[in-house]
């Protein structure tokens, strides 16, 4: 049995989120939360909240034991890119791409 949680349209670039999610893939849930708590990255609080949501889904919806849960799948896919423009010299403008992510976590029992 598995439980999942998904955060969509998170305003962090997927390249930056992938660095954080690679740290917790395959880890026990409590160990993953401890690792993320001490990781100084902007995506860490988002992934912590997502793991807590997946654990709550497992406990409440599927009656799983928290001690047996581990992170079986975790992914950070690219969402839509918001395009903004920055004025530059001589009447030009450059595009600023504000990237978003879709982050998903699946927890399973051992």
Swiss-Prot record:
InterPro entries: Ribosomal_uL22, Ribosomal_uL22_bac/chlpt-type, Ribosomal_uL22_bac/org-type, Ribosomal_uL22_CS, Ribosomal_uL22_sf. GO terms for cellular component: cytosolic large ribosomal subunit. Keywords: Ribonucleoprotein, Ribosomal protein, RNA-binding, rRNA-binding. Gene3D superfamilies: Ribosomal protein L22/L17 (3.90.470.10). PROSITE patterns: RIBOSOMAL_L22 (PS00464). One of its GO terms (biological process) is translation. GO terms for molecular function: rRNA binding; structural constituent of ribosome. It holds the Pfam family Ribosomal_L22. CDD domains: Ribosomal_L22 (cd00336). It comes from the Bacteria. This protein binds specifically to 23S rRNA; its binding is stimulated by other ribosomal proteins, e.g. L4, L17, and L20. It is important during the early stages of 50S assembly. It makes multiple contacts with different domains of the 23S rRNA in the assembled 50S subunit and ribosome. The globular domain of the protein is located near the polypeptide exit tunnel on the outside of the subunit, while an extended beta-hairpin is found that lines the wall of the exit tunnel in the center of the 70S ribosome. Belongs to the universal ribosomal protein uL22 family. Part of the 50S ribosomal subunit. This is Large ribosomal subunit protein uL22. The gene is rplV.
